């Protein structure tokens, strides 16, 4: 009588371990997170921007403080293939690169572009990099999450 109980117990344990081993092992590789075109977003009264097309909402107050400005009319946002967000605005000296974490954006890189401020920045998706163009000056920069290429 004890023998079948032990066998049943061993089988149950084996099934539990087998099920646990097969659990969250599904991995999808070579994911391309890139946005084909930039988003141009206007902050609300609370300095929040919301991109409904790509389902992201965040507060830009800390970026404005870092740039030493109180407000902007709009920000430029684009995401590259590895999933990093690039943020800038007219009057900014820098492009901010953020990594998406659970419920937050963490600053990965602050890329200094100019001391005079960007006049009319625009982002373009270029496959291997993000192109930043200042439409007022014609200056162009190739960026990735580590800086200027």
Give the ranges of each region predicted by the language model:
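C-terminal motif of bacterial Sec signal peptides marking the signal peptidase cleavage site
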Residues: 18-21
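Bacterial signal peptide processing site
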Residues: 23-25
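Repeated scaffold domains used in trafficking and secretory/extracellular systems
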Residues: 28, 68-78, 115-127
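Beta-propeller fold detector
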Residues: 45-62, 106-114, 144
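Short coil/turn segments that connect the beta-strands within blades of beta-propeller domains
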Residues: 82-84, 127-128
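Conserved beta-strand positions in repeat-built beta-propeller and related beta-rich domains
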Residues: 87-91, 132-136
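Structural motif
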Residues: 92-97, 138-144
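Short loop/turn segments that connect beta-strands within beta-propeller blades
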Residues: 99-103, 144-148
């Amino acid at each position: 009588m004890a023998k079948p109980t032990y066998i049943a117990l061993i089988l149950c344990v084996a099934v539990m371990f087998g099920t646990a081993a097969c659990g969250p092992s599904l991995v999808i590789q070579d994911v391309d997170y890139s946005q084909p075109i930039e988003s141009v977003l206007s902050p609300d009264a609370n300095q929040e921007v919301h991109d409904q097309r790509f389902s992201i909402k965040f507060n830009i107050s800390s970026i404005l403080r870092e740039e030493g400005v109180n407000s902007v009319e709009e920000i430029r946002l684009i995401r590259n293939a590895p999933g990093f967000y690039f943020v800038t605005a007219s009057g900014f000296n820098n492009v901010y690169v953020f990594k998406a974490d659970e419920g937050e954006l963490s600053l990965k890189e602050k890329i200094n572009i100019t001391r005079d401020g960007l006049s009319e920045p625009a982002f373009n998706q270029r496959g291997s990099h993000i192109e930043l163009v200042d439409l007022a000056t014609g200056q162009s920069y190739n960026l990735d999450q580590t800086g200027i290429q």
